[in-house]
């Protein structure tokens, strides 16, 4: 009724509409990837498409079926009929990571019978009693994972305290707007030409008092709004001072200049620069839940072994779902896997 009243038609409605009234499509071949994640409705769509396909190719891994909470039943994939090709060689996981993955997989009761081999490199498993003992995270590229969004907050706090540049599903730990403002000031200090669009972003973080002439900050905003092409207009340091009211000496540090920048965030940005983090490039650390990182991989992976109470109860009852989740987690690592002991009574044990 809610959708009907507002004339909403979502993705689920599209699938239902195709199943009920969609035309049969003659196909030479149908390809389905990640088939272990198909829910009941998507399986019905698959069956309808498959009826009119000469050949069907289905790829998936039941050990990575971690979306039962959204209506996915791994049994459908496990019981699928057809000629099976088992891809036996991993080009990601080193030996030590393969070993721990197999230990978890052995706990899964309902599964297809299959084996796969690791890369020839040995790799490394490191266990830490506490997150702050993981000193290796100071260098290199990392995936850091927690079982839930709430648990992942520990990882973001850790990275901010350490001065590490990271990304989450919500974006980079320093926004593009803030980086543009910083880069603009650094360019001004070097005497380079600056676009008015960049200058406007810089002025956003500067309180006018004693730093920008009265009214010039708002004048710049209006000028750009009324003249869209003005965004690309390039101006010199002298022009910025004479026409756009910059009052401070260009030798002033960005830290002192950015008076409209939250102090805690300034301290974090300062620590990034002091550590030599490449803040103008791609963050070297990605923080995500295990479910959110499915499909990802990295040379180095750090995994918090904490669990929420609901997940822990499922784990203690011996349900396969939770073992599959942790199997997915450890197999994100190519070379090094760092396991951090839980700091609560609810943790997964390997």
Annotate each language-model stretch with its function.
Residues 1-6, 10, 18-21, 84-89, ...:
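Flexible, surface-exposed loop/gating regions in the mature catalytic domains
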Residues 23-27, 134-140, 331-332:
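Flexible, charged surface loops at secondary-structure boundaries
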Residues 1-31, 40-45, 58, 68:
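Accessory N-terminal region flanking or inserted into the helicase ATPase core
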Residues 102-136, 145-162, 167-226:
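Helicase-core coupling region on the C-terminal RecA-like lobe
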Residues 14, 97, 329:
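A residue-level signal for conserved active-site and pocket-lining positions in enzyme catalytic cores
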Residues 346-350:
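Long, charged, helix-prone linker segments
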Residues 188-340, 344:
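Conserved helicase C-terminal RecA-like lobe
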Residues 29, 36-122, 139, 143-158, ...:
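Conserved helicase motor core of SF1/SF2 NTP-dependent helicases
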